[in-house]
Curated annotation (Swiss-Prot):
This is N-(5'-phosphoribosyl)anthranilate isomerase. Keywords: Amino-acid biosynthesis, Aromatic amino acid biosynthesis, Isomerase, Tryptophan biosynthesis. GO terms for molecular function: phosphoribosylanthranilate isomerase activity. CDD domains: PRAI. It comes from Pseudomonas savastanoi pv. phaseolicola (strain 1448A / Race 6) (Pseudomonas syringae pv. phaseolicola (strain 1448A / Race 6)). Its EC number is 5.3.1.24. InterPro entries: Aldolase_TIM, PRAI_dom, RibuloseP-bd_barrel, TrpF_fam. One of its GO terms (biological process) is L-tryptophan biosynthetic process. Pfam families: PRAI (PF00697). The gene is trpF.
């Protein structure tokens, strides 16, 4: 099995982005959802991206944003990839000249495989915990046994991951990548360098 990739999401500070890069993260997530405590402004995002070393993918997270809002952000911020974390339809995810991943909030009874096929142009699916009224960042895990073995897209596993459970998650789910936010924080939006290092060490098995 190839190495599992990783994204540290909800970055709001330059020092946290650099800590993620130094620890070996492949990507950082920048939240453009004003209701989130981890939201960043265009100016914050530009400063964070400008400080990054090479080969760190920048992912912009959006929740039910209008096409106008998204295009304005993309005109101002050099994002490599988009993450749609709301109720966006496949058509609403297309047309931005950026690769995208679609977040799915998992609950019992969902036909995850069918939903994945619906988002035919998605580069991958991010599987997160379903909590009613909360689009993401719940800090809670879900039953990984609900994930089908035959998904036709790379799986990015999210939802309540920490340094204490990510190795087990990787062994059980065998995802393409893992995504963490709250599991490496001091408080919402403020990352903890030691927690980032511990998480990445667990991901890499070192």
């Amino acid at each position: 099995m190839s190495a599992v990739r990783s994204k540290i999401c909800g970055i709001t500070r330059i020092e946290d982005a650099l800590a993620a890069a130094e620890a070996g993260a492949d990507a950082i997530g920048l939240v453009f959802y004003p209701k989130s405590p981890r939201a960043v402004t265009v100016l914050q995002a530009r400063a964070i991206i400008a400080a990054l070393p090479p080969f760190i993918t920048t992912v912009g997270l959006f929740v039910n944003a209008s096409r106008c809002e998204l295009n304005e952000t993309l005109d101002a911020v050099a994002l490599d990839m988009l993450q749609f974390h709301g109720d966006e339809t496949p058509d609403e995810c297309d047309g931005y000249h950026r690769p995208y991943i679609k977040a799915l909030r998992v609950k019992a009874g969902d036909d995850i495989a069918q939903v994945c096929r619906t988002y035919r142009n998605a580069r991958g699916v991010l599987l997160d915990t379903y909590v009613e009224g909360v689009p993401g960042g719940t800090g809670e895990t879900f039953d990984w046994a609900l994930i089908p073995d035959d998904l036709d897209k790379p799986v990015i596993l999210a939802g309540g991951l920490t340094s204490a459970n990510v190795a087990q998650a990787i062994a059980q789910v065998r995802p393409y990548a893992v995504d963490v936010s709250g599991g490496v924080e001091k408080s919402k939006g403020i990352k903890d360098r030691e927690k980032i290092l511990a998480f990445m060490s667990a991901v890499h098995g070192t």
